[in-house]
From Swiss-Prot:
SUPFAM superfamilies: L9 N-domain-like (SSF55658), Ribosomal protein L9 C-domain (SSF55653). InterPro entries: Ribosomal_bL9, Ribosomal_bL9/RNase_H1_N, Ribosomal_bL9_bac/chp, Ribosomal_bL9_C, Ribosomal_bL9_C_sf, Ribosomal_bL9_N, Ribosomal_bL9_N_sf. The gene is rplI. One of its GO terms (molecular function) is rRNA binding. Belongs to the bacterial ribosomal protein bL9 family. Binds to the 23S rRNA. This is Large ribosomal subunit protein bL9.
Length: 149
C-alpha cells in the first residue's frame, strides 16, 4: 500500500515522502497514530502543491539573502576598545559585540552564531569578518577596531 508520511517514521522514511509499506503496517500502526495517510490522487496532488510552495519559498529566501549579502559587503563598522602597548586590546572583540554594533550602527539584526569568527579580535586595525546569511550565502564586512580615548 502506498502512503504519504505525515511525520518522520524511524525505519520507514521522513515527513512528506511517499512510501510503499505493507497493508497491515499501514492500517495497524501508521494510520491509527496519524503518522501517514493513504496515497490517493487527492493526497498526491496536495503533496505536490506543498513541495512546489516549499521550493518557491526557499528560492525567494535565497534571492533575498543574495541581495542582503551584496548590501552588507559595503558595510564598515567601527568598534572602540581600550588598548595597551603595541595595539593589543584589553580583552577582545567577540561575535556578540560585532552583532550588537551591527544592530546599533547599521540597524541590521544578525544572530551572533551567524558571524563566523575563528577567534576573537585581539588587536587594533581592520579585520574582515565573514557572516553566514543563508546556508548557501556568506558575505564579509569590515570591522575597524579603534582605540578608545
Amino acid at each position: 500500500m502506498k502512503v504519504i508520511l505525515l511525520k518522520d517514521v524511524k525505519g520507514t522514511g521522513k515527513k512528506g515522502e511517499m512510501k510503499e509499506v505493507s497493508d497491515g503496517y499501514a492500517r495497524n500502526f501508521l494510520f491509527p497514530k496519524k503518522m501517514a495517510v493513504q496515497a490517493d490522487s487527492v493526497a498526491i496532488k496536495e503533496l505536490n502543491e506543498k513541495n512546489k510552495s516549499k521550493e518557491i519559498k526557499a528560492q525567494k529566501e535565497y534571492e533575498e539573502a543574495v541581495l542582503l549579502g551584496k548590501q552588507m559587503e559595503e558595510i564598515n563598522i567601527e568598534i572602540y576598545s581600550k588598548a595597551g602597548e603595541g595595539g593589543r586590546l584589553f580583552g577582545s572583540i567577540t561575535s556578540k559585540e560585532i552583532a550588537e554594533q551591527l544592530k546599533k550602527q547599521k540597524d541590521i539584526d544578525v544572530d551572533k552564531r551567524k558571524i563566523l569568527l575563528d577567534e576573537p579580535i585581539r588587536s587594533l586595525g581592520s579585520t574582515f569578518v565573514e557572516i553566514k546569511i543563508h546556508q548557501k550565502v556568506t558575505t564579509k564586512i569590515r570591522v575597524d577596531v579603534k582605540e578608545k580615548q
